[in-house]
């Protein structure tokens, strides 16, 4: 099957066998119902075993799955009256980041997120979800607007990273990311950041300075891709699987390290298996987080955000 992952092969082979037996059972005089039921029970156990023992590399593949739900997919199910806003008022409109105003269960909010494409044409239009500086500046414009009008900010993170092209550098890519971090640190409204797929380096951080940060169960968050890390460390990108295990990039790793505030469960096999069910899990998390953060004063929100990031990391003195 297209877009299926290597670690799922045993599941797919067994599913194919069950499908063949069911087809044969419909046209044959031989009753294979018992055999089919046994295989279906075996399939359930196999799925439980494989999906509960996924490696970091397995999860990385799920996070990159071409059918994985995007920011706009979730916006359509989670928010009402979404109105997309465009442009950074400086250079242009970057389709790799989408954002606008909406309501969440009656509460006015600003929603911003990276947006990957659904096919080749769309990916070219969206630059594969890798923003230029104008994308980050558009996001900051919307965040400042939210701060002015007292709207909570909800960010969806899903990018390989900021676009590393020449034009992006000429227009101040690093400054745009740094400016977002600087300005977000002093926002007087709640900021919730959710990694829904791949959280790649500075491109992810530019939407990631939240009061609370959550990750989907199979999402990843890292300073560099496993392929890039392997190429730098061992001069061999084919060792990406080894790098993924060493880098501690999974939702479980980051929660254990105290970088994120929670893990959002995924449907069996990954978010792409059931968009509606996955959106409901995100709905629960946003509801709980908003309820907690909206009880904070403006000063408490700024202080909590500052303290959260101050605690991240380790340093030594000589």
Curated annotation (Swiss-Prot):
GO cellular-component term (any): acetyl-CoA carboxylase complex
Pathway recorded for this protein: Lipid metabolism; malonyl-CoA biosynthesis; malonyl-CoA from acetyl-CoA: step 1/1
Gene Ontology MF terms: acetyl-CoA carboxylase activity; ATP binding; carboxyl- or carbamoyltransferase activity
- Keyword ATP-binding included in the entry's annotation: yes
Q: What class of enzyme is it?
A: transferase
Q: What is its main location?
A: cytoplasm
Domain CoA carboxyltransferase C-terminal: where? 38-292
**EC identifiers of the protein:** 2.1.3.15
Q: Where in the cell is it found?
A: Cytoplasm
Q: Which InterPro entries match?
A: Acetyl_CoA_COase_a_su, ClpP/crotonase-like_dom_sf, COA_CT_C
Q: Which UniProt keywords apply?
A: ATP-binding, Cytoplasm, Fatty acid biosynthesis, Fatty acid metabolism, Lipid biosynthesis, Lipid metabolism, Nucleotide-binding, Transferase
- Which family would the database say this protein is a member of? Belongs to the AccA family.
Q: Which NCBIfam families match?
A: accA, AccA_sub, PRK05724.1
Q: What does this protein do?
A: Component of the acetyl coenzyme A carboxylase (ACC) complex. First, biotin carboxylase catalyzes the carboxylation of biotin on its carrier protein (BCCP) and then the CO(2) group is transferred by the carboxyltransferase to acetyl-CoA to form malonyl-CoA.
Q: What is this protein called?
A: Acetyl-coenzyme A carboxylase carboxyl transferase subunit alpha
Q: Which organism is it from?
A: Listeria innocua serovar 6a (strain ATCC BAA-680 / CLIP 11262)
């Amino acid at each position: 099957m297209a877009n299926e992952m290597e670690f799922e092969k045993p599941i797919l082979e067994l599913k194919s066998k069950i499908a063949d037996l069911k087809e044969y059972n419909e046209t044959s005089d031989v009753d294979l119902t018992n055999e089919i039921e046994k295989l279906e029970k075996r399939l359930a156990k196999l799925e439980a075993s494989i999906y509960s023992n996924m490696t970091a590399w397995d999860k990385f593949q799920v996070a990159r799955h071409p059918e994985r739900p995007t920011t706009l997919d979730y916006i359509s199910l989670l928010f009402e009256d979404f109105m997309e806003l465009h442009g950074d008022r400086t250079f242009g409109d970057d389709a790799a980041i989408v954002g606008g105003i909406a309501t969440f269960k009656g509460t006015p909010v600003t929603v911003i997120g990276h947006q990957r494409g659904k096919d080749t044409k769309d990916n070219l239009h969206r630059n594969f979800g890798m923003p230029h500086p104008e994308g980050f500046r558009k996001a900051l414009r919307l965040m400042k607007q939210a701060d002015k009008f007292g709207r909570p900010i909800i960010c969806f993170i899903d990018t390989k990273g900021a676009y590393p092209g020449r034009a992006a550098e000429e227009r101040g890519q690093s400054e745009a990311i740094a400016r977002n971090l600087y300005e977000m640190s002093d926002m007087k409204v709640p900021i919730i950041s959710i990694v829904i797929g791949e959280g790649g380096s500075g491109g992810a951080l530019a939407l990631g300075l939240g009061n609370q940060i959550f990750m989907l169960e199979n999402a990843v968050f890292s300073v560099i891709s496993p392929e890039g890390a392997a190429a730098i460390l061992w001069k061999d990108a084919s060792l990406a699987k080894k790098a993924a295990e060493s880098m501690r990039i999974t939702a479980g790793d980051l929660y254990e390290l105290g970088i994120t505030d929670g893990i959002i469960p995924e449907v069996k096999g990954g978010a792409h298996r059931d968009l509606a069910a996955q959106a409901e899990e995100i709905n629960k998390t946003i509801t709980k987080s908003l309820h907690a953060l909206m009880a904070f004063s403006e000063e408490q929100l700024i202080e909590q955000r500052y303290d959260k990031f101050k605690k991240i990391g380790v340093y030594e003195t000589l």
